[in-house]
Structure formats: structure tokens, C-alpha cells
Amino acid sequence: MVDYLPRSAWRARAATNAASLVRSEVLNLAFHWPGMSKPINAVGDAGKARVASALRGWQAYHMDGRGWSDIAYQVAIDQEGRAWTLRGINIRSGANGDATVNRKYGAVLLVLGPGEKPSAKMTATAKAVVADYRKRFTRIPV
């Protein structure tokens, strides 16, 4: 099981609405990456602060710019392998297109910049996050 950083770790704003996922409806999850102009150095406490700042920026864009209820993704994973609670695994994503798809698929944000490949730490955490999804949503294939 992954040790998820709470929303307070990135000083998230409160969501304006949250719909829970129905366990029997979830079929799988999708990995997304942000449209960043350059990679974020996630190393150490300063790196953690940079990732937290980026998450707040994406949340502001989604809520203020797009009119959504919260940041679109359920979880984020940075290059240091930290897993960040965004909406949370049990809350419906807003990142996969329309409402039907968001009811059936989770959404995980990989904090990657242009040309950046996932680190071994990110990959290990991503695999563990997938395992957590599979424990909660048993229709997700192995």
C-alpha cells in the first residue's frame, strides 16, 4: 500500500463538489501527464515544495479557468516517487473526457516535463498505486 501525501501537503483548496466512484462501475485507470514547459526538479524538500506549487497551479487552472469542482486527477506521482492525494482514489475523476468515462476510469497524473522519462521511483510508485486501485475496484484487469 502506498503512503499518500494528504491534500494538506500541497495546501489544496476545498473541492466545490465530489462524486464517489461506484466500485462495480470502475473498469481501469488512465495515466496523464501535464503540459509543462520544463521538468520540475522534485528532489528534496525544495523539490517537494515545487511539486506542491505546481499542483496548486493546476488546481487553480481547473477550478478557476475551467470551472471544474477540483483538480481533475485523483492522484499525482512525482519523479521522487511521492504519491499525492488530489481528489482521492475513491472520488470520480474529471480528467478522462466525459462523465461516462470518468465513472469508469480513474486518473493518475505523472508529474513529467517535456522529454522526461519516468524515474525508477516514479515507476515503482505507479505500480503500487495501480495495485491500490485493483484492491478497491476489482474489475480492473491484472
Residues covered by each model-derived region:
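Active-site-adjacent loop/helix surface patches within enzyme catalytic domains
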Residues: 1-141
